[in-house]
Structures are given as C-alpha cells and as structure tokens.
C-alpha cells in the first residue's frame, strides 16, 4: 500500500524549487546507474539498490541504502530539507509501481525515517521533466575519444616519432575515452602521447602492466600495477589500491588515465572494479557502461571471474572497505592454479588455458591485452 504522506509533484513545481530553493530540496533519482550517468537533473543523487540488498531487506530498507551520502543523510534526518523528490524514468502514479521497485522501497524508507521533510514523487519522471525543463538537466553523450592525429611525428613529448597511420591497431586509434569526468581509459600508445594527456587535463596515470614504461614521470603522478594479462594473474588484490588512488586524484581535482598495453583487458578491469565499488553496481551494468565508451574492452576469463567475486562482496549489505582484498581470492599470488570463467558462471578446471577453446563465452575475451 502506498504511503499517503507521499504526493505527486508536477515538473513545473520542481523547476521553481530548483530555481529558488535548491539547497532545501533533495532529489533522488531511482533510475539505473547507466541511465543516471548518461543524463540527470542537476544536483540529483542516484539511488542504487542491488538485488541482494533488496532481497535481504525484505521490504524494509535502511536509510543508508537510500541516501548513501552521509552529509545528505544527516541533513535529511535533521529536517533540513523542505522537500525530498523521488523520480524514475516516467512513472505518473505510484500505484503503477511494484512494491519491490527501487522507488517504492525508497518512498517507504523515507516516509518512515525522515524528519520534517515532505516526500514527493516527480510526476512523469525524468522523461517528462527533461522535455519540459532541459535547462535543469545534464546530458553526457558517450565520449568517442580525442580526434587527434594518429601519427606522432613532430609532436613534442611523443615517445615514438616513427609511427604511421597505416596499420595502426584498432586499440591505438583515436584517443583515450572518458569513463567518468575524472577517469579515462586507453592504451600504452595513448600513454606515450603527452599532447593527448595534456589536452584531457590528465594529472595521474595508472600503468597496469609489468613492461610498459612511464614516459613522463617528471610531469605526471604514476601508479604502477605490475600484472600480466594471464589467466594465472591475480588482479583483484590490486583493486583497493587502484580505487584509493583514483579517489585521491579525484578529490584533489585531478584526472586519472588508466592504461595497459592495449587498453582492452587489464586497464578495463581496473575501471570496472572502480565503477562497481564506488557506484555499487553489478558487473554486467558496469561492463555495458564502459563498453559504450570503449567498445573493444575484453577482460580475460580469469579477470571476469575475479570481478564476479568482487561483485558479490561489493553488493553484499555487510561489505567492508576490505572487499577488494578478499580473505580467499580467486587466484592467490604465486600459485599456478588455473580457473576459467564462462561468464557469468565460474568453472574451475585443471587443464591448461590453451585447451579450453571449446568453452563458449557471450562476452568476447582477449588472450593478450
């Protein structure tokens, strides 16, 4: 049953609130992370409830899941918001929603736990609001990378003066792509192009390889993750360090470029782990989000398996800050055990990776990236 304290708010009313008293209004967007990241109302926050969290909550969701930002949650509990407005894609009546939908769970939690704030849902959702009030919305089209010349001839700071456009591998074409405003993904070639990095405002690089050089150590901050693109490699033990590094650069106002040799497997894995942890999303959602920006990403079987294990830890209600360094990792450093994952089901095997070509995988993986 819908809580009667929740009323519909027309788009024109929200527009007036944002124009006059935006600091008194908390907007909670209940759409998927992918939809929210592509376009959203200015100043809104995304409510992300995983299937695991929903199932374990049994209809009674804690406020910490609805408003993960601690500062906003404290302001809400203290009654400092006049209005809390929830929205999804296009709902016009709350009675149309399932009881276990993200917005209904959020409505019930807010009506139960908020203090002194009126709870509303936006009539017509983001679809209607963006059509009527586009000036209060942000829209981020999937970046396609830089349109810079492929040849590094005569480019100051270039590490390679002999490249030619002819025969340039696909993974080196174009430029680094924006995953988030402070996070970029690309190849070792891109990492050797100081002009590209400077154009993007890059201040730090994560080098996810054991043999790619750090070309400009006097100019950029570097973080090295010496992992081979191998089914025996343990990349998950580096997730926490990489995530902390990205966050530290972000918090200082900088931008991070993550690369391996081709920008397909190892560096993509790090970006996926970052999205999963910081946005509490499933692997398939993070994968689709990154693939929209760099279509050739293809983490190897083992890395996909480690990401799946990471997903179960990230989305568990009791997950801790140590989730990126599990007590029992998929592959222990230094061991020779091989585990191949037929996404999304893990299959431990004892034969060599080369003998497993018969395994079919809906997500193409690359043997060497």
Swiss-Prot record:
InterPro entries to which the protein is assigned, alphabetical: Atypical_DUSP_subfamB (IPR020420), Dual-sp_phosphatase_cat-dom (IPR000340), MKP (IPR008343), Prot-tyrosine_phosphatase-like (IPR029021), Rhodanese-like_dom (IPR001763), Rhodanese-like_dom_sf (IPR036873), Tyr_Pase_AS (IPR016130), Tyr_Pase_cat (IPR003595)
Assigned keywords, A-Z: Hydrolase, Meiosis, Nucleus, Phosphoprotein, Protein phosphatase, Stress response
Modified residues (Phosphothreonine): 168
Effect noted on mutating residue 168 to V: Abolishes threonine phosphorylation. No effect on phosphatase activity and MAPK1 binding
Cell location: Nucleus
Any single GO CC term annotated in Swiss-Prot or TrEMBL for this entry: cytoplasm
Pfam family, one: DSPc
EC class (word): hydrolase
Enzyme Commission code(s) on record: 3.1.3.16, 3.1.3.48
Tissue expression remark: Expressed in XIK-2 kidney cells.
Post-translational modification: Phosphorylated by MAPK1/ERK2 at Thr-168 and at one or more serine residues in a progesterone-dependent manner. Phosphorylation reduces its rate of degradation but does not seem to affect phosphatase activity.
GO molecular function: MAP kinase tyrosine/serine/threonine phosphatase activity; phosphoprotein phosphatase activity; protein serine/threonine phosphatase activity; protein tyrosine phosphatase activity
Entry annotation: catalytic residues: 260
SMART domains cross-referenced by the UniProt entry: DSPc (SM00195), PTPc_motif (SM00404), RHOD (SM00450)
Keyword Thylakoid listed: no
SUPFAM superfamilies tied to this protein: (Phosphotyrosine protein) phosphatases II, Rhodanese/Cell cycle control phosphatase
Family the UniProt entry places it in: Belongs to the protein-tyrosine phosphatase family. Non-receptor class dual specificity subfamily.
Any Gene Ontology biological process: negative regulation of meiotic cell cycle
Principal localisation: nucleus
Domain Tyrosine-protein phosphatase residues, every copy: 175-316
UniProt protein name: Dual specificity protein phosphatase 1-A
